[in-house]
Amino acid sequence: MRGLRPALSTFIFLLLITGGVYPLLTTALGQWWFPWQANGSLIREGDTVRGSALIGQNFTGNGYFHGRPSATAEMPYNPQASGGSNLAVSNPELDKLIAARVAALRAANPDASANVPVELVTASASGLDNNITPQAAAWQIPRVAKARNLSVEQLTQLIAKYSQQPLVKYIGQPVVNIVELNLALDKLDE
């Protein structure tokens, strides 16, 4: 029985530290130092939440830039079912899926170049990716320009404005946040 008391007191102490003090401390510090990020990086217009800067959305209309395909279950960009398709590179089903995506993109973008950017046909590991390269966004300019009656130059400038450089120049590549880019497109129409 003597050995039980130190074990039990250690258990209670660690439970309070790891189950109470540590989570409360990290939450408080996160809210203090990074309030926007700690609350989901929500994009707001007035009192309305339009999306998150971290999670893609299913933009399908011709007047919107399309992001990476989503591999989430039940519906595209379902944050509760985050994950990749789990299809191996050697799986013939993946080849069929990519071929179908390429055909659909070529049909929706007849004025674009023949080479479809790879990130427009392959899902990310999370299935929720909201970023594509500026080149993939530029590939879609003819379709978006035609649907919105905007010039290629206007859309090129918009892509450049919403392009984000990597934190370290030689690691990574520039990306465009599709949610922010499409919300900016909607503001042009207002």
Curated annotation (Swiss-Prot):
Assigned keywords, A-Z: ATP-binding, Cell inner membrane, Cell membrane, Ion transport, Membrane, Nucleotide-binding, Potassium, Potassium transport, Transmembrane, Transmembrane helix, Transport
A GO CC term assigned to this protein in UniProt: plasma membrane
Intracellular or extracellular location(s): Cell inner membrane
TM spans (from-to): 10-30
Alphabetized InterPro entries for the sequence: KdpC (IPR003820)
Molecular function GO labels: ATP binding; P-type potassium transmembrane transporter activity
Lipid bilayer topology: Single-pass membrane protein
Domain of life where this protein originates: Bacteria
Subunit-structure text: The system is composed of three essential subunits: KdpA, KdpB and KdpC.
Similarity comment: Belongs to the KdpC family.
Role according to the record: Part of the high-affinity ATP-driven potassium transport (or Kdp) system, which catalyzes the hydrolysis of ATP coupled with the electrogenic transport of potassium into the cytoplasm. This subunit acts as a catalytic chaperone that increases the ATP-binding affinity of the ATP-hydrolyzing subunit KdpB by the formation of a transient KdpB/KdpC/ATP ternary complex.
Protein name in the entry: Potassium-transporting ATPase KdpC subunit
Record lineage: Bacteria, Pseudomonadati, Pseudomonadota, Gammaproteobacteria, Enterobacterales
Gene name as annotated: kdpC
